[in-house]
Amino acid sequence: MTTAARLGIGGPVGSGKTALLECIVPLLTNQGIEVAIVTNDLLTTEDAERLKSGGILPRDRIIGVETGSCPHTAIREDPTMNILAVQDLEQLFPNLNLIMIESGGDNLASTFSYDLVDAYIFVIDVGAGDDIPRKKGPGFMQADLVVINKIDLAPYVNANLNLIRKEASVYRQSKPIAYTNCKTGVGLNEVVNFILERVLFRTALSVKNLEK
């Protein structure tokens, strides 16, 4: 049995982690990538049910884990539940290329254990304020890719997007950043190409503009 690549998706509550999955999974499957998902919630499987209802994957390729603890415990200090869920998916679907593990909503200190994932994406949204980059949380600083989501909301929440771009580049240095709007498709090509090139070691999409 071939082991699938594992990609974490983390970030604060409401930053758009589940919405990002809804947008990028179809783009990956259209490229022939065999995908499955593990979601984390404290006391429910709400995100898993949302993804199943959305039809982006067959329902049995999505597993919801009720962590019953701080969200970061299940992805860092003790990822046993998630590892078991990943193993279940690999046994059920031996041809999987990629398993995406969405953490429960957490804070800027949230990071994934590399015993659980090969790489992880940290999602924030401009609604949290334009000072997020300079707060230098471990999740933001250490993630393999940072996604700054909901960029269309910047003028409505008085967030300076130019300042976010400037400071994010300073504090992330050479680490990649994608600026996204899941409703229009802005920036999704960068996220998908990161997954293809950095996680799956495949050729990037030739289509450079995925905007709707």
Curated annotation (Swiss-Prot):
The keyword Cytoplasm applies. GO terms for cellular component: cytoplasm. It holds the Pfam family cobW. InterPro entries: CobW/HypB/UreG_nucleotide-bd, P-loop_NTPase, UreG. GTP binds at G11, P12, V13, G14, S15, G16, K17, T18. It is found in: Cytoplasm. Its main location: cytoplasm. The keyword Transferase does not apply. Keywords: Chaperone, Cytoplasm, GTP-binding, Nickel insertion, Nucleotide-binding. One of its GO terms (biological process) is urea catabolic process. One of its GO terms (molecular function) is GTPase activity. Belongs to the SIMIBI class G3E GTPase family. UreG subfamily. Facilitates the functional incorporation of the urease nickel metallocenter. This process requires GTP hydrolysis, probably effectuated by UreG. Homodimer. UreD, UreF and UreG form a complex that acts as a GTP-hydrolysis-dependent molecular chaperone, activating the urease apoprotein by helping to assemble the nickel containing metallocenter of UreC. The UreE protein probably delivers the nickel. HAMAP family: UreG (MF_01389). This is Urease accessory protein UreG. It comes from Trichodesmium erythraeum (strain IMS101). The gene is ureG.
